[in-house]
């Protein structure tokens, strides 16, 4: 990797390399046994370490979201190596609430990135306030743009996780939309009579990010291309229930 690239670019390249070498084609199933070997994560660990002196506020306005997504996803990949096959990723001590990453001299937990920065310091599911207190200097790193589709870009290394992606310089909106559509294609189910729509659990956790249940339904239906399915739902004249899938935290380890 060229040393002329900035730390954000090197992080992207290292994360993309790990995905290509140690994940299946879907980007969801990882070989965490191989990733425990130092030689297989040397580039990624070095790219993450280099962020300690990097200020992402120097990036163009459209790039900080991609930077924080890559930082989050890289941190999860490295942390998930501590999880044994068949065990829940959520059982890793302090996975989400302990600082695991240093950027511009500040320590960040995964919750700080997801909820503090990418969601505008909104509360995590089950909490009453955002993770970063008022006046916290880390709030200065909040991206100036907001996009609720970041929910589909965050990797959690488990069976219910979205795919691992490295977000690059291409238009971020296109990359986020691809992540959403991949999720809808894989996880959304519609009843034969259109009476219910099954959606990922994240919609139950963060309905306000999508405008409540009516907004969730609109968000999902806008990404279903099957006219017959849409006609079944339209025939219900709004009498459609949302069902939320269970979330499986088990490590998605390659066999």
Label the model's feature ranges.
Residues 2-255:
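Interaction/scaffold regions that mediate signaling and macromolecular assembly across diverse proteins
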């Amino acid at each position: 990797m060229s040393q002329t690239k900035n730390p954000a670019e090197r992080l992207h390249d290292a994360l993309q390399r790990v995905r290509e070498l140690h994940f299946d084609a879907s980007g969801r199933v990882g070989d965490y046994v191989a990733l425990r070997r130092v030689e297989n994560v040397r580039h990624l660990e070095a790219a993450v370490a280099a962020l300690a002196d990097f200020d992402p506020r120097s990036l163009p306005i459209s790039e900080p979201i991609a930077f924080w997504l890559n930082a989050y996803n890289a941190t999860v990949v490295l942390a998930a190596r501590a999880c044994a096959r068949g065990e829940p990723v959520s059982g890793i001590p302090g996975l989400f609430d302990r600082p695991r990453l240093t950027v511009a001299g500040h320590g960040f937990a995964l919750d700080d990135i997801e909820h503090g920065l990418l969601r505008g310091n909104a509360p995590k599911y089950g909490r009453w306030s955002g993770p970063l207190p008022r006046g916290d200097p880390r709030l200065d790193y909040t991206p100036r743009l907001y996009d609720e589709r970041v929910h589909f870009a965050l990797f959690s290394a488990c069976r219910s996780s979205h795919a691992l992606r490295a977000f690059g310089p291409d238009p971020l909106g296109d990359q986020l939309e691809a992540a959403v559509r991949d999720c809808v294609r894989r996880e959304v189910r519609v009843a034969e009579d259109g009476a219910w729509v099954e959606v990922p659990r994240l919609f139950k956790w963060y309905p306000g990010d999508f405008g409540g249940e009516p907004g969730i339904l609109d968000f999902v239906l806008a990404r279903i291309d099957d006219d017959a399915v849409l006609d079944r739902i339209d025939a219900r004249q709004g009498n459609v229930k949302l069902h939320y899938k269970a979330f499986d935290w088990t490590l998605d380890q390659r066999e």
